[in-house]
Amino acid sequence: MFAYPGDLSLKTGGYGYDRQVLDGLRKLGWQITLLPLGEGFPFPTADTRRGAETALSSIPDGTLVLIDGLAFGVLDAWAGAHAERLQIIALVHHPLALETGLSDEQQQHFRQSEQRALAAARHVIVTSPMTARELASNYGVASSRITVALPGIDKSDVRRVVNAAPQILSVGTLTRRKGHDVLLRALKSVEDLDWQAVIIGSKSLDPSTSEALARQVETLGLEARVQLLGEVDDPQVHFASADIFALASRYEGYGMVFAEALSHGLPIVACHAGAVPDVVPSDAGILVPVDDAPAFGEALRRLLQSPREREMRSAAALQAGSLLPTWADTAAIISNTLDGIS
């Protein structure tokens, strides 16, 4: 059984990971029942929390239950009460307390609740070595209880479009953690150069941030050069037509879009944030400090002014992308882990 919060069809990295893993496990012969837990996690209403706990409590004894960490981290009381009768596996994309924009009180609450929840899990699956280290060091999870299952990529032929002006692509939900505000300030600093930029990502998860970004584009006078597209049906088209990938995330548990950019041979500008340095090789991308718009702008300027450097970093990106796992590899790792527990 797979229990998840929210809308599994949302075009985010976390939900995309979930969908790919479910598809891969089914291809390997697993029979999976889906159990939706409701909206609003990790800040569920009291009614939503009760509904989720009631649904989970009705699961028969001995069932193997994989639960997405976005909900599991705040279901610590339920997890502790049912740890003995169920085989609970947590799927942690990144610790809840490391989300951007939380108050100190919220961070402490999430850290404590997630630590209690993880203590009740038979095993924990994470999407990056960095998250594994974080849980082992700061959440009391023994390394022997953690399996790393890196996100996969869909290997495909790289199709590149020749652009009159360099095309800068950014992909990430319009939330504060993704740092699009930093990217926009950086783009303003290179407006003397020739470029166009496209930002793809859901506008519905954090409407206030989405609206603020739209206002920022207008305030900076970038309406003619920056498109905020929202969700798109086929982001591959945009990866194929881009020259540079840029995302100023303040934290990433892995950063699936960076892996996607590598597989398309795109030079990358990003931040030293979370697992990003583990994903983006130094010869493929330029990493700058978090929230440093001037440094981000200078990195963009380097790539925009030097086609030769873009070519060199593109070749390095393609090489790194060729070594990344496929989704079949990811599913196989998780399948083997579940086999060892069930």
Can you describe what each PLM-predicted range is?
Residues 250:
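Aromatic "clamp/platform" in nucleotide-sugar-dependent glycosyltransferases that forms part
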Residues 160-178, 184-189, 198-200:
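Conserved donor-binding/catalytic core segment of Leloir-type glycosyltransferases
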Residues 130, 149-152:
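Carbohydrate-associated surface elements
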Residues 105-124:
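Membrane-proximal helix-turn-helix segments that form the acceptor-binding/catalytic region
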Residues 267-270:
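Short hydrophobic beta-strand element within catalytic cores of glycosyltransferases
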Residues 196-212:
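Glycosyltransferase donor-sugar binding loop
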